[in-house]
């Protein structure tokens, strides 16, 4: 009889333990998800690895590191550059981490994190090009390509307006296409971010950087919807930790 009572007691304890565990699991708080907009196809910041499916790059690793510091899952949302700010306005994602330059005009409409990298405008040609401009004014009468609605676009437009310089300009949706056309001879030169040019240069490269801006560096930051100061504060706090513990330096050293 005692054994039977003891057995029933142990079974009851076991059942209660299982129920208790199930209840604990069910009430576990689910992580929030940080949706990050980016234009995949902008090396070395966000682009597909050689397998054609894995997304890698500075901004990809930065977004994941920020999410980890904030205790959030990260979902990358691939978006065309010419619609990337509209997507943020509509709420398609919470922020943009896509080599976004912090500019006075953009600060009127959006919030930005503290900067995480500096950038300069530069000119790139083929190594064997007959004409290799050593300053922007030497783009005169050349076929010049750049990505639309970027600071390269703004830089060249302002230069043409200020100097009256004439050149044949071609704008592209993706920087990859700009360099493809430079390679096959449709363009004489490319105006782009120095951080982007770095991924096309080096030993065995077909390209040569012939000029780089020496003053007024640009700075990239995480772009956040105006009024979402709570997220801006969280991102800045996480970014400060990444700078302090060396994670950001490690990410940058991997690609530059």
Regions found by a protein language model. Name each.
Residues 1-33:
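Short, low-complexity disordered leader/linker segments with a strong preference
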Residues 23-26, 73-75, 151-170, 202-212, ...:
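Ligand-binding clefts/hinges and TM-proximal coupling segments of bilobed small-molecule sensing domains
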Residues 27-28, 126-144:
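Flexible hinge/capping segments at coil-to-helix
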Residues 28-100, 171:
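Extracytoplasmic small-molecule ligand-binding "clamshell" domains
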Residues 35-38, 136-152:
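Short loop->beta-strand "edge-of-pocket" segments that line small-molecule binding or catalytic clefts
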Residues 40, 118-127, 194, 198-240, ...:
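Periplasmic-binding protein-like
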Residues 71-73, 89-98, 142-143, 174, ...:
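Alpha-to-beta junction loops
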């Amino acid at each position: 009889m005692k054994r039977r009572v003891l057995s029933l007691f142990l079974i009851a304890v076991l059942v209660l333990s299982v129920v208790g565990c199930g209840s604990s699991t069910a009430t576990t708080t689910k992580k929030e998800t940080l949706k990050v907009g980016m234009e995949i196809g902008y090396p070395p910041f966000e682009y597909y690895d050689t397998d054609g499916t894995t997304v890698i790059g500075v901004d990809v690793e930065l977004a994941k590191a920020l999410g980890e510091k904030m205790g959030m899952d990260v979902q990358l949302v691939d978006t065309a550059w010419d619609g990337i700010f509209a997507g943020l306005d509509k709420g398609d994602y919470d922020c943009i981490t896509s080599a976004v330059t912090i500019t006075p005009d953009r600060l009127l409409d959006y919030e930005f994190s503290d900067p995480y990298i500096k950038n300069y405008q530069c000119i790139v040609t083929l190594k064997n090009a007959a004409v290799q401009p050593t300053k922007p004014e030497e783009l005169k009468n050349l076929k010049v390509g750049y990505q639309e609605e970027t600071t390269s676009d703004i830089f060249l437009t302002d230069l043409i307006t200020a100097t009256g310089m004439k050149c044949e300009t071609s704008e592209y949706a993706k920087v990859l296409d700009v360099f493809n056309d430079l390679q096959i001879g449709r363009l004489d030169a490319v105006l782009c971010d120095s951080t982007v040019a770095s991924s096309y240069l080096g030993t065995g490269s077909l390209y040569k950087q012939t000029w780089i801006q020496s003053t007024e560096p640009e700075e990239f930051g995480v772009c956040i919807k105006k009024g979402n100061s709570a997220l801006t504060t969280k991102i800045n706090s996480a970014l400060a930790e990444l700078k302090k513990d060396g994670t950001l330096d490690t990410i940058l050293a991997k690609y530059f």
